[in-house]
Protein backbone atom coordinates (compact mmCIF):
# COMPACT_ATOMS: atom_id res chain seq x y z
CA UNK A 1 0.00 0.00 0.00
CA UNK A 2 2.38 2.75 1.23
CA UNK A 3 0.97 6.29 1.61
CA UNK A 4 0.63 9.37 -0.62
CA UNK A 5 2.54 8.10 -3.68
CA UNK A 6 3.26 4.85 -5.53
CA UNK A 7 4.40 3.57 -8.94
CA UNK A 8 1.16 4.76 -10.56
CA UNK A 9 1.64 8.38 -9.44
CA UNK A 10 2.03 10.73 -12.42
CA UNK A 11 4.37 13.58 -11.52
CA UNK A 12 4.99 16.99 -13.07
CA UNK A 13 7.66 19.48 -12.05
CA UNK A 14 7.02 23.21 -11.59
CA UNK A 15 10.20 25.11 -12.34
CA UNK A 16 11.09 22.23 -14.66
CA UNK A 17 13.70 23.92 -16.86
CA UNK A 18 15.62 25.64 -14.04
CA UNK A 19 18.87 24.15 -12.73
CA UNK A 20 17.33 22.57 -9.61
CA UNK A 21 14.24 21.33 -11.45
CA UNK A 22 16.41 19.82 -14.17
CA UNK A 23 18.88 18.09 -11.86
CA UNK A 24 16.33 16.59 -9.49
CA UNK A 25 13.94 15.59 -12.29
CA UNK A 26 16.82 13.69 -13.90
CA UNK A 27 17.43 11.94 -10.57
CA UNK A 28 13.73 11.11 -10.17
CA UNK A 29 13.49 9.70 -13.70
CA UNK A 30 16.63 7.60 -13.13
CA UNK A 31 15.02 6.25 -9.93
CA UNK A 32 11.96 5.14 -11.87
CA UNK A 33 9.50 7.89 -10.94
CA UNK A 34 6.74 8.33 -13.50
CA UNK A 35 7.57 11.92 -14.53
CA UNK A 36 5.12 12.99 -17.24
CA UNK A 37 6.12 16.61 -17.93
CA UNK A 38 6.85 19.98 -16.43
CA UNK A 39 5.75 23.59 -16.16
CA UNK A 40 7.79 26.70 -16.94
CA UNK A 41 5.74 29.78 -17.94
CA UNK A 42 6.77 31.03 -21.38
CA UNK A 43 8.42 27.76 -22.41
CA UNK A 44 5.29 25.79 -23.26
CA UNK A 45 5.51 23.72 -26.43
CA UNK A 46 9.14 22.78 -25.92
CA UNK A 47 10.52 19.50 -24.62
CA UNK A 48 12.99 19.11 -21.76
CA UNK A 49 14.56 15.82 -20.64
CA UNK A 50 12.46 14.27 -23.44
CA UNK A 51 9.29 15.39 -21.64
CA UNK A 52 6.77 18.07 -22.67
CA UNK A 53 6.91 21.55 -21.12
CA UNK A 54 3.68 23.47 -20.45
CA UNK A 55 2.94 27.08 -19.56
CA UNK A 56 0.45 26.28 -16.79
CA UNK A 57 -0.34 23.50 -14.32
CA UNK A 58 -3.92 23.35 -15.65
CA UNK A 59 -2.62 22.60 -19.14
CA UNK A 60 -0.07 20.07 -17.86
CA UNK A 61 -2.73 18.21 -15.90
CA UNK A 62 -5.18 18.21 -18.82
CA UNK A 63 -2.58 16.81 -21.23
CA UNK A 64 -0.78 14.32 -18.96
CA UNK A 65 -3.29 13.31 -16.28
CA UNK A 66 -0.76 14.28 -13.61
CA UNK A 67 -1.89 13.85 -10.00
CA UNK A 68 1.29 15.03 -8.25
CA UNK A 69 3.61 18.01 -8.61
CA UNK A 70 7.02 18.92 -7.23
CA UNK A 71 7.97 22.59 -6.95
CA UNK A 72 11.49 23.93 -7.48
CA UNK A 73 10.70 27.64 -7.67
CA UNK A 74 12.49 30.56 -5.89
CA UNK A 75 10.94 31.66 -2.57
CA UNK A 76 9.38 34.86 -3.91
CA UNK A 77 7.28 32.93 -6.44
CA UNK A 78 6.84 29.56 -4.73
CA UNK A 79 3.56 30.35 -2.96
CA UNK A 80 1.97 31.34 -6.28
CA UNK A 81 3.17 28.03 -7.73
CA UNK A 82 1.53 26.14 -4.86
CA UNK A 83 -1.70 28.13 -5.30
CA UNK A 84 -1.69 27.32 -9.02
CA UNK A 85 -1.37 23.60 -8.24
CA UNK A 86 -4.19 23.82 -5.68
CA UNK A 87 -6.37 25.60 -8.24
CA UNK A 88 -5.66 22.81 -10.75
CA UNK A 89 -6.69 20.25 -8.09
CA UNK A 90 -3.38 18.38 -8.09
CA UNK A 91 -3.74 15.74 -5.36
CA UNK A 92 -0.20 15.74 -3.92
CA UNK A 93 1.99 18.85 -4.11
CA UNK A 94 5.55 18.71 -2.78
CA UNK A 95 7.28 22.07 -2.29
CA UNK A 96 11.04 21.86 -1.73
CA UNK A 97 11.68 25.63 -1.58
CA UNK A 98 13.13 27.14 1.60
CA UNK A 99 12.59 30.76 2.62
CA UNK A 100 8.99 31.34 1.51
CA UNK A 101 7.64 34.38 3.44
CA UNK A 102 5.40 33.33 6.33
CA UNK A 103 2.51 35.56 5.19
CA UNK A 104 2.63 33.92 1.75
CA UNK A 105 2.30 30.53 3.43
CA UNK A 106 -0.62 31.75 5.55
CA UNK A 107 -2.48 32.46 2.29
CA UNK A 108 -1.55 29.01 0.98
CA UNK A 109 -2.74 27.39 4.21
CA UNK A 110 -6.10 29.14 3.82
CA UNK A 111 -6.40 27.98 0.19
CA UNK A 112 -5.75 24.37 1.24
CA UNK A 113 -8.86 24.34 3.44
CA UNK A 114 -11.56 22.41 1.59
CA UNK A 115 -9.30 21.82 -1.42
CA UNK A 116 -8.43 18.49 -3.06
CA UNK A 117 -4.71 19.05 -2.53
CA UNK A 118 -2.36 17.57 0.06
CA UNK A 119 0.70 19.85 0.40
CA UNK A 120 4.00 18.41 1.63
CA UNK A 121 6.46 21.09 2.75
CA UNK A 122 7.65 23.70 2.07
CA UNK A 123 11.33 23.59 3.06
CA UNK A 124 11.37 19.81 2.95
CA UNK A 125 13.23 16.95 1.23
CA UNK A 126 10.01 15.52 -0.23
CA UNK A 127 8.34 12.10 -0.22
CA UNK A 128 9.54 8.69 -1.35
CA UNK A 129 7.95 5.26 -1.57
CA UNK A 130 11.08 3.13 -2.07
CA UNK A 131 11.37 1.30 -5.37
CA UNK A 132 8.27 3.03 -6.73
CA UNK A 133 8.26 6.83 -6.68
CA UNK A 134 10.69 9.54 -5.52
CA UNK A 135 9.45 13.14 -5.35
CA UNK A 136 12.10 15.45 -3.95
CA UNK A 137 15.81 15.76 -3.22
CA UNK A 138 16.51 12.69 -1.08
CA UNK A 139 19.25 10.25 -2.18
CA UNK A 140 17.39 7.29 -3.65
CA UNK A 141 20.08 4.65 -3.14
CA UNK A 142 19.87 4.58 0.67
CA UNK A 143 16.20 3.56 0.62
CA UNK A 144 14.90 0.01 0.69
CA UNK A 145 11.36 -1.29 0.37
CA UNK A 146 10.14 -2.30 3.80
CA UNK A 147 7.74 -1.77 6.67
CA UNK A 148 8.82 1.37 8.56
CA UNK A 149 6.98 4.64 7.96
CA UNK A 150 9.22 7.67 8.54
CA UNK A 151 8.00 11.23 9.13
CA UNK A 152 10.39 14.05 9.94
CA UNK A 153 10.82 17.82 10.23
CA UNK A 154 14.49 17.45 9.28
CA UNK A 155 15.79 16.38 5.88
CA UNK A 156 19.23 15.08 6.83
CA UNK A 157 17.94 13.30 9.93
CA UNK A 158 15.40 11.59 7.66
CA UNK A 159 18.29 10.23 5.62
CA UNK A 160 19.98 9.07 8.83
CA UNK A 161 16.86 7.14 9.89
CA UNK A 162 16.52 5.71 6.38
CA UNK A 163 20.15 4.55 6.18
CA UNK A 164 19.88 2.93 9.62
CA UNK A 165 16.57 1.13 8.98
CA UNK A 166 17.99 -0.09 5.66
CA UNK A 167 21.17 -1.30 7.39
CA UNK A 168 19.25 -3.38 9.96
CA UNK A 169 17.09 -4.90 7.22
CA UNK A 170 13.76 -3.23 8.05
CA UNK A 171 13.42 -0.86 5.09
CA UNK A 172 10.74 1.79 4.64
CA UNK A 173 7.12 1.84 3.41
CA UNK A 174 7.07 5.60 2.74
CA UNK A 175 9.23 8.47 4.02
CA UNK A 176 7.75 11.95 4.38
CA UNK A 177 9.71 15.11 5.09
CA UNK A 178 7.12 17.58 6.38
CA UNK A 179 9.56 20.50 6.44
CA UNK A 180 11.05 22.84 9.00
CA UNK A 181 8.99 25.99 8.47
CA UNK A 182 6.48 27.28 11.05
CA UNK A 183 3.61 27.11 8.53
CA UNK A 184 3.46 23.93 6.46
CA UNK A 185 0.91 21.85 4.60
CA UNK A 186 1.07 18.47 6.31
CA UNK A 187 1.93 17.81 9.95
CA UNK A 188 2.92 14.87 12.13
CA UNK A 189 -0.68 14.03 13.01
CA UNK A 190 -1.66 13.81 9.32
CA UNK A 191 1.23 11.46 8.51
CA UNK A 192 0.94 9.30 11.62
CA UNK A 193 -2.79 8.89 10.93
CA UNK A 194 -2.02 7.69 7.39
CA UNK A 195 0.73 5.34 8.59
CA UNK A 196 -1.48 3.84 11.31
CA UNK A 197 -4.14 3.06 8.69
CA UNK A 198 -1.63 1.65 6.17
CA UNK A 199 -1.40 -2.17 6.21
CA UNK A 200 2.15 -2.17 4.83
CA UNK A 201 3.49 0.08 7.60
CA UNK A 202 4.26 -2.02 10.69
CA UNK A 203 6.00 0.67 12.76
CA UNK A 204 6.72 4.42 12.65
CA UNK A 205 9.75 6.64 13.17
CA UNK A 206 8.98 10.26 14.01
CA UNK A 207 11.79 12.83 14.00
CA UNK A 208 10.94 16.17 15.56
CA UNK A 209 12.84 19.21 16.72
CA UNK A 210 12.50 22.16 19.06
CA UNK A 211 9.93 24.87 18.35
CA UNK A 212 6.16 24.91 17.97
CA UNK A 213 3.82 22.27 19.35
CA UNK A 214 3.57 19.77 16.46
CA UNK A 215 5.19 16.99 18.48
CA UNK A 216 2.91 17.59 21.48
CA UNK A 217 -0.11 17.45 19.14
CA UNK A 218 1.20 14.18 17.72
CA UNK A 219 1.65 12.76 21.23
CA UNK A 220 -1.96 13.59 22.09
CA UNK A 221 -3.15 12.01 18.81
CA UNK A 222 -1.14 8.84 19.44
CA UNK A 223 -2.55 8.62 22.96
CA UNK A 224 -6.14 8.89 21.69
CA UNK A 225 -5.73 6.61 18.65
CA UNK A 226 -7.49 3.24 18.69
CA UNK A 227 -4.93 1.82 16.24
CA UNK A 228 -1.59 1.14 17.92
CA UNK A 229 1.77 0.53 16.25
CA UNK A 230 5.33 0.69 17.64
CA UNK A 231 6.66 4.26 17.36
CA UNK A 232 10.22 5.47 17.89
CA UNK A 233 10.97 9.19 18.17
CA UNK A 234 14.05 11.40 18.21
CA UNK A 235 13.82 15.12 19.01
CA UNK A 236 16.67 17.35 17.82
CA UNK A 237 17.77 20.31 19.92
CA UNK A 238 18.03 18.96 23.46
CA UNK A 239 20.91 21.37 24.20
CA UNK A 240 19.49 24.34 22.25
CA UNK A 241 19.33 27.65 24.15
CA UNK A 242 15.92 29.41 24.37
CA UNK A 243 15.29 32.25 21.91
CA UNK A 244 17.88 31.17 19.35
CA UNK A 245 16.74 29.87 15.96
CA UNK A 246 18.48 26.58 15.20
CA UNK A 247 18.67 26.25 11.41
CA UNK A 248 15.00 25.94 10.47
CA UNK A 249 12.66 28.93 10.68
CA UNK A 250 10.39 26.94 13.00
CA UNK A 251 13.17 25.62 15.25
CA UNK A 252 13.08 28.13 18.09
CA UNK A 253 12.08 27.83 21.75
CA UNK A 254 9.88 30.88 22.34
CA UNK A 255 7.56 31.98 25.14
CA UNK A 256 8.81 29.18 27.35
CA UNK A 257 7.38 26.54 25.00
CA UNK A 258 8.76 24.21 22.37
CA UNK A 259 11.71 22.71 24.25
CA UNK A 260 12.98 19.23 23.45
CA UNK A 261 12.35 18.03 27.00
CA UNK A 262 8.68 19.09 26.84
CA UNK A 263 8.26 17.17 23.60
CA UNK A 264 10.07 14.07 24.85
CA UNK A 265 7.94 14.03 28.00
CA UNK A 266 4.71 14.32 25.98
CA UNK A 267 5.74 11.53 23.61
CA UNK A 268 6.86 9.21 26.40
CA UNK A 269 3.54 9.69 28.18
CA UNK A 270 1.85 8.58 24.94
CA UNK A 271 3.82 5.33 24.93
CA UNK A 272 6.36 6.34 22.29
CA UNK A 273 9.87 4.86 22.59
CA UNK A 274 12.44 7.65 22.79
CA UNK A 275 16.04 7.66 21.59
CA UNK A 276 18.29 10.53 22.64
CA UNK A 277 20.91 9.91 19.96
CA UNK A 278 20.29 10.11 16.20
CA UNK A 279 22.84 7.30 15.81
CA UNK A 280 20.52 4.86 17.63
CA UNK A 281 17.27 5.38 15.69
CA UNK A 282 17.54 2.21 13.58
CA UNK A 283 18.84 0.02 16.42
CA UNK A 284 16.11 1.26 18.77
CA UNK A 285 13.43 0.37 16.23
CA UNK A 286 15.00 -3.03 15.49
CA UNK A 287 15.22 -3.87 19.21
CA UNK A 288 11.64 -2.69 19.80
CA UNK A 289 10.30 -4.95 17.05
CA UNK A 290 12.35 -7.95 18.16
CA UNK A 291 11.97 -7.89 21.93
CA UNK A 292 10.40 -10.84 23.68
UniProtKB/Swiss-Prot annotation:
Q: Which residues bind CoA?
A: 17-20, 43, 96-98
- GO biological processes: tricarboxylic acid cycle
Tell me the enzyme class.
ligase
State the active site.
248 (tele-phosphohistidine intermediate)
Q: Catalytic activity annotated for this protein?
A: succinate + ATP + CoA = succinyl-CoA + ADP + phosphate; GTP + succinate + CoA = succinyl-CoA + GDP + phosphate
Q: Where does substrate bind?
A: 159
Q: What is its EC number?
A: 6.2.1.5
Q: Which domain of life is it from?
A: Bacteria
Protein's UniProt keywords contain Nucleotide-binding: yes
Cellular component GO terms, alphabetically? succinate-CoA ligase complex (ADP-forming)
| Keywords, alphabetical | Ligase, Nucleotide-binding, Tricarboxylic acid cycle
Pathway linked to the protein: Carbohydrate metabolism; tricarboxylic acid cycle; succinate from succinyl-CoA (ligase route): step 1/1
- Mind telling me which PROSITE patterns this protein's record contains? SUCCINYL_COA_LIG_1 (PS01216), SUCCINYL_COA_LIG_2 (PS00399)
Record keywords: Nucleotide-binding included?
yes
Gene Ontology MF term list: nucleotide binding; succinate-CoA ligase (ADP-forming) activity; succinate-CoA ligase (GDP-forming) activity
Q: What does this protein do?
A: Succinyl-CoA synthetase functions in the citric acid cycle (TCA), coupling the hydrolysis of succinyl-CoA to the synthesis of either ATP or GTP and thus represents the only step of substrate-level phosphorylation in the TCA. The alpha subunit of the enzyme binds the substrates coenzyme A and phosphate, while succinate binding and nucleotide specificity is provided by the beta subunit.
- Annotated NCBIfam families: PRK05678.1 (NF004230), sucCoAalpha (TIGR01019)
Q: Which family does it belong to?
A: Belongs to the succinate/malate CoA ligase alpha subunit family.
Assembly and binders? Heterotetramer of two alpha and two beta subunits.
Identify this protein by name.
Answer: Succinate--CoA ligase [ADP-forming] subunit alpha
> What is the native source organism of this protein?
Rickettsia felis (strain ATCC VR-1525 / URRWXCal2)
The organism's taxonomic lineage, starting at the top: Bacteria, Pseudomonadati, Pseudomonadota, Alphaproteobacteria, Rickettsiales
Amino acid sequence: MAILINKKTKVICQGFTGSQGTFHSEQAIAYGTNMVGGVTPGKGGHTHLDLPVYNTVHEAKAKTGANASVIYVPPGFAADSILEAIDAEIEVVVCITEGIPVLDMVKVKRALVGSKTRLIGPNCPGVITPGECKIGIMPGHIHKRGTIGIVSRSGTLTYEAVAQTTAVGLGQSTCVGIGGDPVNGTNFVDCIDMFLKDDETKAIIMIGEIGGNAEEDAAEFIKQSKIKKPIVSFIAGITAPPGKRMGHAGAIIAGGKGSAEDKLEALQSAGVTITRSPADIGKTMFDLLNKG
